[in-house]
C-alpha cells in the first residue's frame, strides 16, 4: 500500500491540472501560433513558466485506485496488475477471464 501522503499529493496534482488546464491551453496556443509575434510568444512562455509546476498533466502518475501502487497500472481498469488479477479471479470484472490455449 502506498503512503497516504503520496496518494494525497497525487490528488493535489489532479486538482491543479484541472484548475489551470484552460489557462495552459490558451498560452500553448499562443506559443504555437504562426501569426503571433515573437514578443507575444515570449510573454506567453514566461507566463507558462510562472504557473505551478504540478499544474502540468505530464507530472501526474497513474495509481491503483485500491492500493495507490504507481507501477503496473492498467488504464482501462484503474487497478494495478496484482489487484486486477485478484478481482478477475473472484469474477468481479465482467467479461474478463483467464486466458487458456
UniProtKB/Swiss-Prot annotation:
Per the record, its GO cellular-component terms are: cytoplasm; small ribosomal subunit
Q: Where is the signal peptide?
A: none
Protein's GO biological process: translation
The yes or no answer to whether the keyword rRNA-binding is present is yes
Q: Which UniProt keywords apply?
A: Ribonucleoprotein, Ribosomal protein, RNA-binding, rRNA-binding
Name the Gene Ontology molecular function terms of this record: rRNA binding; structural constituent of ribosome
In terms of InterPro entries, this protein maps to: Ribosomal_uS14, Ribosomal_uS14_bac/plastid, Ribosomal_uS14_CS
UniProt superkingdom: Bacteria
Kindly name one Pfam family recorded for this protein.
Answer: Ribosomal_S14
Give the disulfide map. none
> What is the similarity comment for this entry?
Belongs to the universal ribosomal protein uS14 family.
Tell me how this protein assembles.
Answer: Part of the 30S ribosomal subunit. Contacts proteins S3 and S10.
Q: Give a short account of what the protein does.
A: Binds 16S rRNA, required for the assembly of 30S particles and may also be responsible for determining the conformation of the 16S rRNA at the A site.
UniProt-listed PANTHER family? 30S RIBOSOMAL PROTEIN S14 (PTHR19836), SMALL RIBOSOMAL SUBUNIT PROTEIN US14M (PTHR19836:SF19)
Spell out the protein name for this chain. Answer: Small ribosomal subunit protein uS14
Amino acid at each position: 500500500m502506498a503512503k497516504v501522503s503520496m496518494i494525497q499529493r497525487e490528488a493535489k496534482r489532479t486538482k491543479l491540472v484541472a484548475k489551470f488546464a484552460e489557462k495552459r491551453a490558451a498560452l500553448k496556443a499562443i506559443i504555437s501560433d504562426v501569426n503571433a509575434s515573437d514578443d507575444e510568444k515570449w510573454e506567453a512562455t514566461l507566463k507558462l513558466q510562472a504557473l505551478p509546476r504540478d499544474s502540468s498533466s505530464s507530472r501526474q502518475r497513474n495509481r491503483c485506485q485500491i492500493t495507490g501502487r504507481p507501477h503496473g497500472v492498467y488504464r482501462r481498469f484503474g487497478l494495478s496488475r496484482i489487484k486486477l488479477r485478484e478481482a478477475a479471479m473472484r469474477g468481479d470484472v465482467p467479461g474478463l477471464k483467464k486466458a487458456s490455449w
